[in-house]
Amino acid sequence: MHLTTEKELINMNDLTTIDTNNYAEMAKAMGIANEAPSQKKQGMFLARLRINHSPILGSDTIKVKGGTYKLEIPDGPTYYAESAVMRPFLQRFMYKKFVMGSAGTPNRYVKTVMADTLNMDLKDNDGGFNCGKPSGWIEDFKSLPDATKELIRSIKRVRVVLGTVELVNPKDADGNPVDLGTTSFIWEVENRDAFKTVGNVFTQLAKMKRLPVQHNVTLNTEERKLPNGNSFYVPNTSLDVTNSVELTQE
């Protein structure tokens, strides 16, 4: 049994001078500083750049055409533009797989961590690796079981680009012009042709021994037709190699 000493009684007497305007100090003195529920910290999220494949229709007009770029602001509106100027800071790679939901279970994505190469096993958010894709090089794809083939086909290679982007003549979802400055963004490029097209920008910069952050890339889109007559769009990139962006400490 712990006996209260005279010294401790003296410290307790100090509490008779209670400063209600200094909660932190008083809570520490009274032993309740660690009893408050932890506050969930809200993370910082980047705007997401995507290609908008379908037009946004009004009652009798097209408000936003298909084949535009859209910039989704976290907890905010989405803006659209036919062209954009991207300043890439870096690229990373990951695997991604769409999982269809069922009754009571929503659709979701399985994603791996990002890395600077896909030549390694990457931990995914399902507790496995590579979204279930077998490790190593597959020499004979045709010899694999059909279930394994379907699994591999369902897993996307994703090139993740981070940097800043400026939409050219941006509009809101109603087609109204808006003022929008340069915005930090993340772009997950998963279409096979788009993966290669955007990758060519980084390949060209590497051959020039230039850093991505030193150059701007103009983004447009190119229409592709599906057998059923529908359209989808892939990025069209133009790297500005003549002008270099000055790097500052800001």
Pin down the residues of each PLM region.
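Extended, charge-rich, solvent-exposed interface segments
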Residues: 244-250
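OB-fold ssDNA-binding interfaces and closely related basic DNA-contact patches used
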Residues: 2-177, 226-244
